[in-house]
Amino acid sequence: MNYIYYLCLQMKKLFNIAGPCVPGEHYMIPALERNNQAERLIENKHYFVIHAARQTGKTTLLKSLVQHINSQGKYHALYCSLEAVQGIDNPREGIFQIVAQLKKALFFEDVKAKEVLDEIRTDADFTTLIYLSVARFSQALEKPLVLLFDEVDCLGNGTLITFLRQLRDGYINRDKIPFAHSIALVGMRNIRDYKAKIRDDGKTLGSASPFNVITESFTIGNFSPEEVAS
């Protein structure tokens, strides 16, 4: 018997409170079974928000979704954490860093379409950089793109507004120009909380609010007594 495989068989599962849970390594309730509305929203081409408190399983859910979606072969799902963009309010810098995180998320993926991101100039207009990156990548893929952005809370207000405006531009024009089939924005706040936070800082969103791109949101609840008992 392979020695490493033998060691894996001998490993005991652990309770995990530091980062996403891994099936086979940690005691966990299957994330997709508890949050099956995510698949429905993706199938219906929605852009949506998942919000919940810390350590409630958001990242575990996203990673489970990526694995499940890609195993089915219908869509290409990509997980992208925006934690490294934390606190960058200037969109000229923040938007460039978001694209850098997209490239990082694709680095180890065997997807030829990722090469199109390298063709986009680093000095491109920041007001269209996200839009062009997602549009070109979507066009180069052989399957519809599902983007799962984690830690959206980290974005500074200026970066967040510019980021969402470009997603909205892609959303409303995707009948003519390829763009993401579905996008999830994940963090601790609901979309209404983002709007309130920015308005409290005295910034106007205008009539074409970038938050109008979001069609639905849901939260991850606490475990039920039945789930704990299982």
Where are the regions a protein language model picked out?
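Short acidic, S/G/P-rich loop/turn micro-motifs used as interaction or catalytic elements
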Residues: 85-87, 153-156, 191-192
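The start of beta-strands in P-loop NTPase/AAA+ ATPase cores
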Residues: 46, 76, 145-146
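Non-catalytic architectural context of zinc metalloproteases
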Residues: 66-75, 92
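Mid-core helix/loop region of P-loop NTP-binding domains shared across ATPases and GTPases
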Residues: 101-149, 153-165, 173-182, 210
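Walker A/P-loop-proximal flanking segment of P-loop NTPase domains
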Residues: 2-56, 60-69, 132, 136-137
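An amphipathic alpha-helix signature
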Residues: 91-99, 225-229
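The catalytic "switch" region of P-loop NTPases
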Residues: 18-20, 159-230
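Conserved catalytic segments around the Walker B and adjacent sensor/switch elements
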Residues: 71-87
